[in-house]
A protein has these predicted regions:
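TM-loop-TM module centered on a large, flexible mid-protein loop between adjacent transmembrane helices
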Residues: 64-69, 240-295, 346
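Hydrophobic alpha-helical segments and their helix-loop junctions in multi-pass secondary transporters
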Residues: 90, 94, 151-179, 197-198, ...
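Membrane-interface loop-to-helix entry segments
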Residues: 133-161, 344-356, 375-385
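Hydrophobic, small-residue-rich membrane helices and short re-entrant helix-turn-helix hairpins
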Residues: 134-145, 184, 207-236, 254-261, ...
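A generic transmembrane alpha-helix motif of multi-pass inner-membrane proteins
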Residues: 183, 375-447
Length: 447
């Protein structure tokens, strides 16, 4: 029981960040009277893919890189992991933590000014850099204590908010054409924004090293603990997401305000709901907790990404990479939260489908033999379709977008699934089959 609880807190700590707070309320507001299909879509991608990928990573002999080298190609493996670490690092996740903490924790107390964000980001990244440069464990230790407390407080906010605002009807203006299927697709894509499935690939190495410290007595105990913790963590996040989405769905956001391109609805809902329910003190308390949680996440990401690049390209030291990535994160953060989200989504719509296919092959190939060429074809098809689809959407290429509608589920931004399934079937038919190694529990315990 103790191992399960500790492991659950470990997994929760890996994923919980301010980004997990702002997207469910935004989705709730946008989904109008189609809240449940939207939330289910969000949970499938934001919870299911993330926790599934991390759990798969804990039962791989050698990690995702070794699997990609063997099943696909070392060059693809390197390119994919570099793109992934840059996404969860200096380009998207790191600057987003700064902007989210500013939007929720600082901006409500300041006059509207661009300089406020720049000054805050400079101080924020100076502190983060100092802690990451010296690889301080202090903030990590604080984060392990504060993260579950903060999550509990957010859940309390959600429960109180449900009673306070639950009778308010969802905003339907301009959303009458939203179907259940479209809402599910919107929720599924919105779940990409959490970045958790991508982070799971990176954090699986840390998870394995931490799990080794528990000294499981048998493989059965290890597997039972992992599965039960996965279920419990999934339920916990799902309850949190449902509550936050419900709050966003029923909290009154003026239509004119919601149209402001610089406003993040999720941040606004959390901030204003805290103020209405608990007054200025409650809002200030939320602000402090968000800033500390975000700072913890930022330091952890700078360290993880810096260590990956130091190991991959040892010509430069960790401290050089930490410096460079902190500066990049600061520069991107000054663009503002909405701009970061807008630029990140097209990239995530490419990386997420690839990650799903990779996780599928890594898991299933332990039991079912697949052709190596077939697996390469599947990843190639997924990469091409998701890239073309993302570009068509981002660049508003109507002709290309129309042509892609021939693909099943393309209307839900899941057009890559059809070609991926065809690739998987081909991988089952072609002769050059290989089978992944079974999880070596003894080696896991002794390494």
């Amino acid at each position: 029981m103790k191992k399960g609880l500790l492991t659950g807190l470990l997994l929760f700590g890996f994923f919980f960040g301010a980004g997990n707070l702002i997207f469910p309320p935004t989705l709730g507001y946008q989904s109008a009277d189609q809240l449940w299909p939207a939330v289910i879509g969000f949970i499938v991608s934001g919870v299911g893919l993330a926790i599934g990928t991390l759990l798969i990573g804990t039962v791989i002999n050698g990690g995702f890189k070794k699997e990609l080298d063997e099943k696909i190609h070392p060059i693809f493996s390197l390119a994919y992991l570099i793109a992934l670490y840059l996404a969860i690092g200096p380009f998207f996740a790191i600057p987003r933590t700064a902007t989210v903490s500013y939007n929720i924790g600082v901006a409500p107390f300041l006059p509207d000014s661009k300089s406020g964000l720049i000054i805050y980001a400079a101080i924020y990244f100076a502190v983060a850099f100092y802690l990451a440069y010296n690889r301080s464990s202090l903030l990590s230790s604080i984060g392990k204590i504060l993260t579950p407390i903060f999550a509990g407080l957010i859940l309390f906010l959600v429960v109180v908010g449900a009673f306070k605002f639950g009778q308010t009807s969802p905003e339907l203006a301009g959303k009458t054409d939203l179907t259940a299927a479209k809402a599910f697709g919107n929720g599924f894509i919105e779940g990409y924004n959490t970045l958790d499935a991508l982070a799971a690939v990176a954090f699986s190495v840390v998870a394995v090293n931490t799990l080794k410290e528990f000294h499981f007595s048998s493989k059965k105990e290890f597997e039972k603990t992992i599965m039960s913790v996965g279920v419990v963590t999934a339920i916990g996040f799902s309850v949190l997401y449902i509550g936050l989405a419900f709050l966003g769905n029923h909290f009154n956001v003026a239509s004119a305000l919601a149209k402001d391109a610089d406003l993040n609805v999720g941040s606004y809902v959390l901030t204003m709901a805290s103020r209405e329910l608990f007054g200025t003190f409650g809002q200030a308390f939320l602000a402090v907790m968000v800033i500390i949680t975000c700072l913890t996440t930022t330091v952890g990401l700078i360290v993880s990404v810096g260590e990956f690049f130091e190991e991959t390209f040892p010509r430069f030291s960790y401290k050089v990479y930490a410096t460079v990535f902190t500066l990049i994160g600061f520069g991107v953060a000054t663009l503002g939260l909405q701009t970061i989200i807008a630029f990140s989504l097209p990239v995530l719509m490419i990386l997420y489908p690839i990650t799903v296919v990779i996780a599928f092959f890594v898991l299933v190939n332990k039991k079912v033999a697949f052709s190596k060429r077939g697996m390469q074809l599947t990843v190639a098809l997924t990469t091409i379709i998701s890239t073309v689809s993302s570009l068509a959407s981002a660049l508003k290429l109507e002709g290309l977008a129309k042509a892609l509608e021939i693909l099943p589920l393309q209307g839900l931004s899941l057009g890559w699934m059809g070609p991926a399934i065809i690739g998987i079937l081909i991988a089952l038919i072609l002769p050059d089959k290989i089978k992944g190694e079974a999880f070596d529990f003894e080696a896991f315990q002794t390494k």
